[in-house]
């Protein structure tokens, strides 16, 4: 008999060799029906996996991220199966699950069209009804290559040949279709209830511009049609909120072919940016942080010492100065460490909290660039904290509370993920255990719920990631807290303890916005361009009905500016209805309309973007109202 520990801590005994699907049935027939995959000792596996030793088990459904991923991974295979049925000459490349669905890359001597997608989708629906079992099998390297050569699948042959010697080579078969795949997958194609093919794109083989351009088909999959309908509605809403479209319409930023991935901020965009950065500085000063600034370009030797050269080189830009090799910084931490090393520190100085709005450059493939969300140059709102091991819990709790304050201000819900040691990492098992437990204890002490993301930590330490949920249900990873024992070791950082001896500090890397540019993009989409008054580039649009109100309009404008209210005037010879509509399209929070009645009464007619016509009030009353709104940062 073997002992299986369930997620809730319950221990059950079963015969050795039992399949996970049978365990799911014994736990609950309802769970068996919903089950898509499972985690055994943290590793995601098929439900048909047999268990031969004591293990921890979590049954995954569509409510779990890896449950969704597994279902959508199977969706990608069903897409490939449908394409091969309809167009047998097409060659298969790769087809993974992604955050919101899946894709598959194909080589074809024709161009896929939207009409073809409809045919392919209809074929997928047939495959769902056929309810093929997904059967995993393994082959020795030579047999695997032979199988793929017989099927004329050149890309699969290349993938197999690139696998290390001794690597398990596995395939999945569903009906008349077989694909090279590590898995896992759902038990049968009938588990995928609703599929939608979404779009077409080009993609270079292996993401390398030197390789052949393939055709990529994107799709998504759900267990219920109602979930698919909800998702499709979200996509339509997202199109309306696209920050690239709104950024252009609202004159916030632009991106030019002279600098792909390098955004240009316009005056109105700079207002939003400066407000976010000023608020960031104010809150960090209150929380005991000291701001620093470090250079953009630093000697190559620094990046060898930090480990970035070994772990991050392909994402970096380089230059040569005075016959020496330099790198443009992809991260702020090594420069911040040099600031710490510049002085001797006592235990009385700790914790030391150094913050930096530092510009970093990271190479992204051109196909991955996306407005402000994925760029090559951005400002990271970093902070690096240095502390003793005894201070870890208290400092992490303080950071979490600060992050919570920021996200609540902007109206975001969020969830937290604790990411543990990746395969490509530095440091001892003991340090990783202390660091990971430190983060766990901080989260547990304030009752913060979190998920564990095994193996997704930074190469130098475990981390807590904060995922924002926007108003249409999408998630964005922004803030992060990373505990680091490695950098202090590599840079020989120290402080003088109470015993007069040198000790090694613990270092924490931390962001809130993540990337300022990306956060602005998220806010544009969160608010659909209609920023709250305190953040709006233009807070008031002042407009006259005829030229006779011009002098009064200028007095009102002056009074607003004296009170630091951002105002624009519209004195064009246009109908007032046209001016109002334009201001509404520009998402201005308030419009003040001045006619002869307002001039005579010394009032302003107020129209709110949110509440419509508010009637005529005194200018003083309006100024007091809007100043309170700005001061309280009302959403």
UniProtKB/Swiss-Prot annotation:
Cross-referenced SMART domains: tRNA_SAD
Cofactor binding notes: Binds 1 zinc ion per subunit.
Gene Ontology BP annotations: threonyl-tRNA aminoacylation
Claim: Ligase is one of the keywords in the record: yes
Residues the entry annotates as binding Zn(2+): 333, 384, 509
Region feature Catalytic, mapped onto this chain: 242-532
Subcellular location(s) per record: Cytoplasm
Required co-factors: Zn(2+)
InterPro entries per record: aa-tRNA-synt_IIb (IPR002314), aa-tRNA-synth_II (IPR006195), aa-tRNA-synth_II/BPL/LPL (IPR045864), Anticodon-bd (IPR004154), Anticodon-bd_dom_sf (IPR036621), Beta-grasp_dom_sf (IPR012675), TGS (IPR004095), TGS-like (IPR012676)
Function: Catalyzes the attachment of threonine to tRNA(Thr) in a two-step reaction: L-threonine is first activated by ATP to form Thr-AMP and then transferred to the acceptor end of tRNA(Thr). Also edits incorrectly charged L-seryl-tRNA(Thr).
Membership in a protein family: Belongs to the class-II aminoacyl-tRNA synthetase family.
Subunit text: Homodimer.
UniProt-recorded name of the protein: Threonine--tRNA ligase
Taxon lineage: Bacteria, Bacillati, Bacillota, Clostridia, Eubacteriales
Gene name of the record: thrS
């Amino acid at each position: 008999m073997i002992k299986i520990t369930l997620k809730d801590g319950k221990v059950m005994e079963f015969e050795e060799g039992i399949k996970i699907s049978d365990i799911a049935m014994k736990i609950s027939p309802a769970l068996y029906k919903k089950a898509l995959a499972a985690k055994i000792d943290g590793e995601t596996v098929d439900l048909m996996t047999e268990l031969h030793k004591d293990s921890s088990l979590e049954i995954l459904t569509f409510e779990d991220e890896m449950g969704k991923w597994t279902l959508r991974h199977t969706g990608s295979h069903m897409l490939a199966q449908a394409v091969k049925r309809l167009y047998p000459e097409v060659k298969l490349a790769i087809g993974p699950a992604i955050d919101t669905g899946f894709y598959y890359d194909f080589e074809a001597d024709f161009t896929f069209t939207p009409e073809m997608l409809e045919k392919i989708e209809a074929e997928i629906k047939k495959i769902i009804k056929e309810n093929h079992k997904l059967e995993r099998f393994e082959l020795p390297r030579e047999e695997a290559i032979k199988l793929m050569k017989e099927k004329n699948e050149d890309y699969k042959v290349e993938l197999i040949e690139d696998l290390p010697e001794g690597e398990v080579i596995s395939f999945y078969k569903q009906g008349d279709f077989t694909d090279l795949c590590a898995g896992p997958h759902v038990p049968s194609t009938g588990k995928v209830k609703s599929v939608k093919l979404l779009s077409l794109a080009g993609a270079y083989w292996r993401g390398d511009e030197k390789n052949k351009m393939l055709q990529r088909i994107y799709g998504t999959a759900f267990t219920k049609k109602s979930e698919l309908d909800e998702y499709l509605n979200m996509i339509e809403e997202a199109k309306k909120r696209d920050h690239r479209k709104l950024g252009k319409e609202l004159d916030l930023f632009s991106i030019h072919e002279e600098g792909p991935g390098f955004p240009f901020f316009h005056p109105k965009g700079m207002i939003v940016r400066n407000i976010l950065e000023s608020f960031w500085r104010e809150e960090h000063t209150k929380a005991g942080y000291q701001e620093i600034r470090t250079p953009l370009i630093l000697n190559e030797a620094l990046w060898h010492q930090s480990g970035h050269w070994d772990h991050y080189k392909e994402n970096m830009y380089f230059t040569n100065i005075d016959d020496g090799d330099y790198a443009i910084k992809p991260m702020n931490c090594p420069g911040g460490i040099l600031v710490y090393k510049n002085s001797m520190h006592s235990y009385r100085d700790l914790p030391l909290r150094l913050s930096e709005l530092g510009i970093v450059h990271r190479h992204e493939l051109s196909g991955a660039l996306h407005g402000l969300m994925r760029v090559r140059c951005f400002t990271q709102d970093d902070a690096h904290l240095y502390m003793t091991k005894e201070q870890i819990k208290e400092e992490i709790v303080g950071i979490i509370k600060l992050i919570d304050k920021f996200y609540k201000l902007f109206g975001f819900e969020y969830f937290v993920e604790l990411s543990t040691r990746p395969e490509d990492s530095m440091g001892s098992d003991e340090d990783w255990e202390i660091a990971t437990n430190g983060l766990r204890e901080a989260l547990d002490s304030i009752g913060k719920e979190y998920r564990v993301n095994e193996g997704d930590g930074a190469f130098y330490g475990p981390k807590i990631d904060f995922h924002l949920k926007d108003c249409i249900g999408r998630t964005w990873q922004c803030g992060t807290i990373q505990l680091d024992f490695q950098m202090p070791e590599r840079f020989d950082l120290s402080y003088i303890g109470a015993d007069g001896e040198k000790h090694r500090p613990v270092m924490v890397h931390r962001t809130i916005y993540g990337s300022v540019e990306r956060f602005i993009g998220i806010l544009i989409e969160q608010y659909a361009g209609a920023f709250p008054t305190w953040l709006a580039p233009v807070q008031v649009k002042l407009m006259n009905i005829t030229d006779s109100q011009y002098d009064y309009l200028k007095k009102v404008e002056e009074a607003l500016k004296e009170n630091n209210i951002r105002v624009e005037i519209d004195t064009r010879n246009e109908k007032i209805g046209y001016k109002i509509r334009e201001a509404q399209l520009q998402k201005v929070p308030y419009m003040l309309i001045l006619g002869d009645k307002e001039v005579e009464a010394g009032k302003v007619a107020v129209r709110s973007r949110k509440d419509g016509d508010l009637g005529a009030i005194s200018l003083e009353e309006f100024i007091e109202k809007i100043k309170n709104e700005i001061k309280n940062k009302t959403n």
